Amino acid sequence: SRTGKQFKNLAHIELALIGFFKQNPDVILDGELYNHKLKNDFEKIISLVRKQKPTADDRLDAQHLVQFHVYDYFDGVKYDSYKTRMQQLSFNKQIYCASIKFVPARLVDSYNYARDIHAEFLDQGYEGSIIRLDGLYKHGRSYDLMKFKDFSDTEATIIGYETGKGKRQGTLGK
């Protein structure tokens, strides 16, 4: 994980990357655990990833459903531009397989082009897109990175509620 926590149900991803990291021990692959087939059930991915004592069935489900989507690369030594890091990711094709996916980037030079690409991603079922400046790698949050999402705002009238029970006591909802 980003904080160094080891996940116990992702042996298939670890196995897919072990050779790469033996040859490149200082490299950081930045990405997220995802599967676009589960875009409407992200909780399923989270549930499989967070299993502390996975069963054989849990491991099999994770192997078929959880993928690591790689979108950035840092070699631990050089501070390269994003464009150079993307080239490194595309050169290392040996790591990509059913469990490891490369997230391609496109150079955007206008707001209209960014909107067009964003519309493509929405049509494919993604919730948005990411805009990244051609800057140096930065661990954690970065001002070089911005989410591009569409939001809708609406008002509603509350017609009823339930009081919370157990750990939700004193709040609304189950």
Predicted regions located by residue number:
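Covalent nucleotidyltransferase
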Residues: 1-98
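Nucleic-acid 5′ end/cap handling module spanning
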Residues: 1-3, 58-60, 64-65, 73-76, ...
